[in-house]
């Protein structure tokens, strides 16, 4: 609740949260962004976190489907390859997504290749996005691509090929971050594709208006602030 309310009060509609990956100790880029190592604990903690986000009026985004925690490579700078079987992934990494699907407004897939399942990375894979996420898990919310500038997306080709692969696999919106030239290239390509508006994206709009003044007047914010101060030993 606290994160969501303060982000909304800053004028931002939503955060790409929470991380549903497992903290296996293998992935440094996931690391302590994950709630825990065990799927059940991740599911319980993430469910509470998302309920708080919803209470504050913010939509949720679970990432990185179907799980980034079991690869050492960083998808920002490399193309990670997960060598496990589908059965192993289902038993571990996929569990938080399956258990939390009712609280998820959006999902962000991983730029990871699960080579024994599909040769394409998850964000460009119809199998992962359509067969598993939409079909088996029954997810009907928004699918965001992860940042298409990342090295993990390079397996699909150049920026135009990455966009085509993401949209073709089932992404509702693509992300192109921290690279203005590639963002302009993406916009031009999308105009050529004549991509129309997607009604699913309306789910991501804020559901409650917060301002800094309203937040400071909120009893719930006051209680949360006091709790944080007690936990950290710091008064703001």
Identify what each model region corresponds to.
Residues 25-35, 74-77:
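Surface-exposed, active-site-proximal loop segments in enzymatic domains
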Residues 32-39, 83:
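Active-site oxyanion-binding pockets that recognize sulfate/phosphate
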Residues 47-199, 207-214, 219, 230:
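Second-shell residues forming the walls of enzyme active-site clefts
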Residues 3-22, 42, 49-66:
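Glycine-rich, aromatic-flanked loop segments that form ligand/cofactor-binding clefts
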Residues 1-6, 37-45, 87-90:
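Glycine-rich anion/phosphate-binding loops
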Residues 225-236:
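Charge-patterned, long linear interaction tracts outside catalytic cores
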Residues 1-9, 126-131:
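Short secondary-structure boundary segments
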Residues 220-224:
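C-terminal basic regulatory modules in eukaryotic proteins
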